[in-house]
């Protein structure tokens, strides 16, 4: 594969979202329930963090069970990724009702790779420069594509991509979110911020899974 059609993939991602919106809502029920406890205490946690880091307001203790709520939120986030990756690649029949994701080998493998990728992308923030985060993210795209493989019970394998294709995947997945973030900064409304965050989560998941489908389909055709 030598080229990834950016415009066509963006349009395909939008078409998928609009044509499968009911299923997307259904597979989000369980992840949303897992994330809800943290969402309810988020304003209180933000107040504590602002007091500790920036000296804004009075320093208070963290809410009760916040660590448990953080774990539940992470579980919910991973669950929505797995559900969307399966929905895009394998179809609606491959996703459990209401998007329930139970502990399994698949979930464990997904979590381990997800954790390693998350740590790798955040390393520049602590040791070098935050400006290098996009570069690290770009370099890790072939490994990140295996998250889609694992979600669909496909064995892990090294995915080799030409630099041009890798750049296209990077732009497709992060181009729209970057535009939305810039728009939110200009508007500055809190409600718009949360709507944009939800859109970004779904966009990145759907577009990335579609990129995976295109790459796998082209590689299979070339091997015939």
Put a short name on every predicted segment.
Residues 43-53, 122-129, 183-191:
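Juxtamembrane "helix-exit" motif on the non-cytosolic side of transmembrane helices
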Residues 60-92, 122-154, 189-219:
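Selective recognition of hydrophobic, aromatic-rich stretches within alpha-helical transmembrane segments
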Residues 1-4, 34, 45-46, 72, ...:
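Detector for methionine-enriched segments
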Residues 5, 60, 94-96:
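A diffuse structural propensity rather than consistent per-protein peaks
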Residues 23-91, 178:
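Short, small/hydrophobic-residue-rich motifs at membrane-helix boundaries and re-entrant hairpins
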Residues 1, 55-59, 198:
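Charge-dense, low-complexity intrinsically disordered segments
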Residues 95, 219-224:
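Short, Lys/Arg-enriched, Gly/Pro-containing loop segments at transmembrane-helix junctions
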Residues 2-34, 98-123, 138-185, 224:
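Interfacial aromatic "cap" segments that immediately flank transmembrane helices
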